[in-house]
Amino acid sequence: MPGIKLRKLRAKDIPQIIAIHGAITKKKAYHRWIQQMVKDHLRKQEGVGFVAEKEGQVVGFIIGEIKGEGFGLEKSGWLEVVMVHPRHMGMGIGYAMACKLFDYFRRRGIRDVHTSVLWDAVDMLSFFKSLGFDRSTFINLIKHVDQKSIHFSS
Protein backbone atom coordinates (compact mmCIF):
# COMPACT_ATOMS: atom_id res chain seq x y z
CA MET A 1 0.00 0.00 0.00
CA PRO A 2 2.17 2.83 -1.20
CA GLY A 3 1.64 6.07 0.67
CA ILE A 4 -0.37 4.47 3.50
CA LYS A 5 0.98 4.68 7.05
CA LEU A 6 -0.52 2.76 9.99
CA ARG A 7 -0.25 4.20 13.48
CA LYS A 8 -1.98 4.18 16.86
CA LEU A 9 -5.30 5.97 17.04
CA ARG A 10 -5.25 9.30 18.93
CA ALA A 11 -8.01 11.51 20.32
CA LYS A 12 -7.25 14.17 17.70
CA ASP A 13 -8.30 11.63 15.01
CA ILE A 14 -11.92 11.66 16.18
CA PRO A 15 -13.20 14.31 13.71
CA GLN A 16 -11.74 12.37 10.76
CA ILE A 17 -13.12 9.10 12.16
CA ILE A 18 -16.57 10.72 12.40
CA ALA A 19 -16.23 11.85 8.78
CA ILE A 20 -15.37 8.30 7.65
CA HIS A 21 -18.27 6.90 9.66
CA GLY A 22 -20.62 9.47 8.12
CA ALA A 23 -19.39 8.77 4.58
CA ILE A 24 -20.20 5.09 5.06
CA THR A 25 -23.41 5.17 7.10
CA LYS A 26 -24.86 8.49 5.84
CA LYS A 27 -26.30 8.93 9.36
CA LYS A 28 -25.41 11.96 11.46
CA ALA A 29 -27.35 10.56 14.41
CA TYR A 30 -24.48 8.22 15.22
CA HIS A 31 -21.74 10.88 15.29
CA ARG A 32 -22.02 11.37 19.04
CA TRP A 33 -22.00 7.60 19.56
CA ILE A 34 -18.85 7.04 17.47
CA GLN A 35 -17.12 9.97 19.19
CA GLN A 36 -17.93 8.57 22.65
CA MET A 37 -17.00 5.02 21.63
CA VAL A 38 -13.56 6.15 20.43
CA LYS A 39 -12.98 8.22 23.59
CA ASP A 40 -14.01 5.28 25.78
CA HIS A 41 -11.65 2.94 23.94
CA LEU A 42 -8.75 5.35 24.33
CA ARG A 43 -9.32 5.30 28.11
CA LYS A 44 -9.52 1.52 28.40
CA GLN A 45 -6.34 -0.24 29.43
CA GLU A 46 -7.17 -3.18 27.17
CA GLY A 47 -8.52 -1.08 24.28
CA VAL A 48 -6.51 -0.49 21.13
CA GLY A 49 -7.03 1.33 17.89
CA PHE A 50 -5.09 2.08 14.72
CA VAL A 51 -5.62 4.45 11.85
CA ALA A 52 -4.45 4.39 8.26
CA GLU A 53 -3.13 7.71 7.00
CA LYS A 54 -2.59 8.87 3.45
CA GLU A 55 -0.93 12.24 2.93
CA GLY A 56 -1.72 13.20 6.54
CA GLN A 57 -5.41 12.34 6.26
CA VAL A 58 -7.02 9.47 8.18
CA VAL A 59 -8.58 7.17 5.56
CA GLY A 60 -9.43 4.21 7.80
CA PHE A 61 -9.57 3.07 11.40
CA ILE A 62 -9.88 -0.11 13.42
CA ILE A 63 -10.73 -0.52 17.10
CA GLY A 64 -10.28 -3.64 19.18
CA GLU A 65 -10.14 -4.75 22.75
CA ILE A 66 -8.81 -7.57 24.87
CA LYS A 67 -11.62 -8.96 26.99
CA GLY A 68 -11.33 -11.25 29.97
CA GLU A 69 -12.71 -14.69 30.29
CA GLY A 70 -16.45 -15.03 30.13
CA PHE A 71 -19.21 -16.97 28.42
CA GLY A 72 -16.89 -19.99 28.39
CA LEU A 73 -14.17 -18.14 26.45
CA GLU A 74 -10.53 -17.68 27.28
CA LYS A 75 -9.14 -14.15 27.37
CA SER A 76 -9.59 -13.06 23.78
CA GLY A 77 -9.36 -10.21 21.31
CA TRP A 78 -12.40 -8.48 19.90
CA LEU A 79 -12.45 -6.53 16.68
CA GLU A 80 -15.06 -3.90 17.55
CA VAL A 81 -15.19 -1.77 14.41
CA VAL A 82 -13.26 -1.35 11.17
CA MET A 83 -14.02 1.29 8.54
CA VAL A 84 -12.26 2.61 5.46
CA HIS A 85 -13.41 5.73 3.65
CA PRO A 86 -15.34 4.69 0.51
CA ARG A 87 -12.83 6.47 -1.76
CA HIS A 88 -10.09 4.21 -0.39
CA MET A 89 -11.90 0.86 -0.20
CA GLY A 90 -10.51 -2.08 -2.13
CA MET A 91 -6.87 -1.04 -1.65
CA GLY A 92 -6.04 -3.47 1.17
CA ILE A 93 -6.22 -0.83 3.91
CA GLY A 94 -8.77 -2.69 6.04
CA TYR A 95 -6.79 -5.90 5.64
CA ALA A 96 -3.54 -4.17 6.69
CA MET A 97 -5.17 -2.59 9.76
CA ALA A 98 -6.67 -5.94 10.77
CA CYS A 99 -3.27 -7.63 10.46
CA LYS A 100 -1.75 -4.92 12.68
CA LEU A 101 -4.51 -5.48 15.24
CA PHE A 102 -3.99 -9.26 15.12
CA ASP A 103 -0.25 -8.77 15.66
CA TYR A 104 -1.02 -6.57 18.67
CA PHE A 105 -3.22 -9.32 20.11
CA ARG A 106 -0.67 -12.05 19.32
CA ARG A 107 2.12 -10.18 21.14
CA ARG A 108 -0.12 -10.12 24.21
CA GLY A 109 -0.74 -13.86 24.18
CA ILE A 110 -4.19 -13.72 22.59
CA ARG A 111 -5.02 -16.72 20.42
CA ASP A 112 -8.60 -16.02 19.33
CA VAL A 113 -10.21 -12.89 17.91
CA HIS A 114 -13.97 -12.42 17.77
CA THR A 115 -16.18 -9.96 15.93
CA SER A 116 -19.83 -9.52 15.02
CA VAL A 117 -21.29 -8.67 11.65
CA LEU A 118 -24.80 -8.21 10.30
CA TRP A 119 -25.85 -11.44 8.62
CA ASP A 120 -26.79 -9.64 5.39
CA ALA A 121 -23.64 -7.47 5.18
CA VAL A 122 -22.18 -9.54 2.36
CA ASP A 123 -19.23 -7.20 1.78
CA MET A 124 -18.21 -7.35 5.45
CA LEU A 125 -18.73 -11.12 5.62
CA SER A 126 -16.45 -11.48 2.61
CA PHE A 127 -13.88 -9.16 4.20
CA PHE A 128 -13.85 -11.12 7.46
CA LYS A 129 -13.65 -14.42 5.56
CA SER A 130 -10.56 -13.08 3.72
CA LEU A 131 -8.99 -12.48 7.14
CA GLY A 132 -9.63 -16.09 8.19
CA PHE A 133 -12.73 -15.55 10.34
CA ASP A 134 -15.27 -18.36 10.47
CA ARG A 135 -18.52 -18.98 12.31
CA SER A 136 -18.15 -19.16 16.05
CA THR A 137 -20.04 -21.27 18.54
CA PHE A 138 -22.07 -18.20 19.53
CA ILE A 139 -25.14 -16.68 18.00
CA ASN A 140 -26.30 -13.17 18.78
CA LEU A 141 -29.72 -12.84 20.34
CA ILE A 142 -31.84 -9.75 20.76
CA LYS A 143 -34.86 -8.86 22.84
CA HIS A 144 -36.67 -5.58 22.35
CA VAL A 145 -37.74 -4.08 25.65
CA ASP A 146 -40.83 -1.95 25.34
CA GLN A 147 -42.73 0.12 27.90
CA LYS A 148 -44.53 -2.87 29.36
CA SER A 149 -43.17 -4.41 32.52
CA ILE A 150 -42.16 -8.02 32.53
CA HIS A 151 -43.77 -9.93 35.37
CA PHE A 152 -42.91 -13.29 36.75
CA SER A 153 -44.58 -15.32 39.41
CA SER A 154 -42.73 -16.95 42.24
Regions found by a protein language model. Give the residues of each.
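A short beta-loop-alpha structural element at the N-terminal edge
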Residues: 3-17
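Acetyl-CoA-dependent GNAT
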Residues: 11-12, 19-74, 80, 144
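A short, internal acetyl-CoA/4′-phosphopantetheine-binding micro-motif in the GNAT/acyltransferase core
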Residues: 79-89, 117
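Conserved acetyl-CoA-binding loop-helix of GNAT-fold acetyltransferases
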Residues: 84, 90-103, 130
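Conserved active-site alpha-helix within GNAT-family acetyltransferase domains
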Residues: 95, 107, 119-137
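Conserved GNAT acetyl-CoA-binding A-motif
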Residues: 105-117
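Terminal substrate-recognition subdomain of acyl/acetyltransferases
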Residues: 129-154
